[in-house]
Amino acid sequence: MADPSFASGRLGSRLQGSIAMIAEELLRAGRLDDALKALQEQVRSQPSNATLRIFLFQLLAVMGQWARAQNQLKVVGELDASALPMVQTYSTAIDCEALRREVFAGRLTPVILGQPAEWIAPLLQALSLDAEGHGEAAQALREQAFDAAPAVPGRIGEAPFAWLADADTRLGPVLEVIVNGRYAWLPMSNLRSLKVEAPSDLRDLVWLPAELTLANGGATVALLPARYAETVEHGDDAARLGRKTEWLDSGLPVGQRLFVTDAGETALFDLRELDFEPTDA
């Protein structure tokens, strides 16, 4: 699995020579609370520095402090008009995190992208049953959905597979995406290809940009939630930074997203290109 130590990328190149480098070093060491304290001190000393506030927004997002991250984005937009496209993109991504939590709590239904699939309904019903404490019934519905979902072969890079699924059994053959500012589920049977690059900014550890080609030939850009939904609440700093994937006693995963196939496992940050073979459906 890729170990994305603090991937400052473009941001880091603008922080060279700044005391904010202390915060970056603390991030490399996986010390989120200490990094936040150091960065907040620097922002207080340079409140009109938009670059520092972008750094702060990203760090707060990694830590799941969504309201504070949203506030920093607002300030960035006021300080630097050229940053407004980024501000809009990630402001809606933060909003989608709230909706995402409601979906996994069984209280909301996500948008479904592409051709409707009947097997999606049991997956959503299972989330509601989980919330009501009916774990066995939820698992039965998931098994029903997995049996009905088509196994679509393809390749990860040059490595072939007969089927692919998310390691989170609540999702299985479904990909979580943020497209056009909306949180959605994309059945993998509706996906032709996915392309991503390695994380190059801290925010990529939360939402990884991707290029999607749908089975119907349409193409779009998206953000992929890079960490599992319970990561902020139940994961440690390494999980929040996407440096590992682990399972809680409840069976739920935290940390970096992981895909499983008949041939093995691939972490999201190790993935560059995923291609599914065309189907008759």
Swiss-Prot record:
Note, other: The T6SS protein TagJ/HsiE1 is unique to the H1-T6SS and absent from the H2- and H3-T6SSs.
Phenotypic effect of disruption: Deletion has no detectable effect on the T6SS-mediated secretion of VgrG1a/c, Hcp1 or Tse3.
Coiled-coil intervals: none
Quaternary data: Interacts with TssB1 (via N-terminus). Interacts with ClpV1.
Name of the protein in question: Type VI secretion system accessory component TagJ
Protein role: Component of the H1 type VI (H1-T6SS) secretion system that plays a role in the release of toxins targeting both eukaryotic and prokaryotic species. Forms a stable complex with TssB1. This complex, although not crucial for the H1-T6SS function, may fine-tune the assembly of the system. Plays a role in the interaction between ClpV1 and the TssC1/TssB1 sheath.
One protein family per Pfam: TPR_19
InterPro entries the UniProt entry points to: TagJ (IPR009211), TPR-like_helical_dom_sf (IPR011990)
